[in-house]
């Protein structure tokens, strides 16, 4: 994964710089998300790793994407095809989203709880994270009964494990040492 990120980073950064310059960050995010989905398609996978000439591969990829990709996006696809990098489009899209969130002072937080959270609880978590991170927070909530009770919050590098399962695990480690 780290290798894919290293390969994808210059493409994502270049795309982000162009998007900011042309005030089209959301448009680029949509284009890259769509292109990433196309590159992950099981029909497209063999073509990306095959021996098809880069110009033909780029033309095929662009025709599959149709009007979902503008001229600047098509140029990115052509450059990536020339360098044999179309298979890293999902990583480019992911990095672009990270750059976008950083630029917009936003962060996505994954919240896993033992039971469904009420809208009031979600708002409390969101407000607390916004204060702590000094960013606008978008919550992605899910449930996992294995937590027993409590929540686990992941926002960027920050991980807060307030679950009973986590507390039991830490207690067990202390007792064994």
UniProtKB/Swiss-Prot annotation:
What is the residue range of the signal peptide feature? none
What PROSITE patterns does the record point to?
A: ATPASE_DELTA (PS00389)
GO MF assignments: proton-transporting ATP synthase activity, rotational mechanism
Q: Does the keyword Cell membrane apply?
A: yes
Tell me where in or outside the cell this protein is found. Answer: Cell inner membrane
Q: Which UniProt keywords apply?
A: ATP synthesis, Cell inner membrane, Cell membrane, CF(1), Hydrogen ion transport, Ion transport, Membrane, Transport
Q: Which GO terms describe its cellular component?
A: plasma membrane; proton-transporting ATP synthase complex
Main localization category: membrane
Its membrane topology: Peripheral membrane protein
Q: Does the keyword Zinc apply?
A: no
Oligomeric state and interaction partners are given as:
F-type ATPases have 2 components, F(1) - the catalytic core - and F(0) - the membrane proton channel. F(1) has five subunits: alpha(3), beta(3), gamma(1), delta(1), epsilon(1). F(0) has three main subunits: a(1), b(2) and c(10-14). The alpha and beta chains form an alternating ring which encloses part of the gamma chain. F(1) is attached to F(0) by a central stalk formed by the gamma and epsilon chains, while a peripheral stalk is formed by the delta and b chains.
What is the documented function of this protein? Answer: F(1)F(0) ATP synthase produces ATP from ADP in the presence of a proton or sodium gradient. F-type ATPases consist of two structural domains, F(1) containing the extramembraneous catalytic core and F(0) containing the membrane proton channel, linked together by a central stalk and a peripheral stalk. During catalysis, ATP synthesis in the catalytic domain of F(1) is coupled via a rotary mechanism of the central stalk subunits to proton translocation. This protein is part of the stalk that links CF(0) to CF(1). It either transmits conformational changes from CF(0) to CF(1) or is implicated in proton conduction.
What family does the entry list? Answer: Belongs to the ATPase delta chain family.
NCBIfam families in alphabetical order? ATP_synt_delta (TIGR01145), PRK05758.2-2 (NF004402), PRK05758.2-5 (NF004404)
Which PANTHER family does the protein's record reference? ATP SYNTHASE DELTA CHAIN (PTHR11910)
Q: Per its record, how is this protein called by name?
A: ATP synthase subunit delta
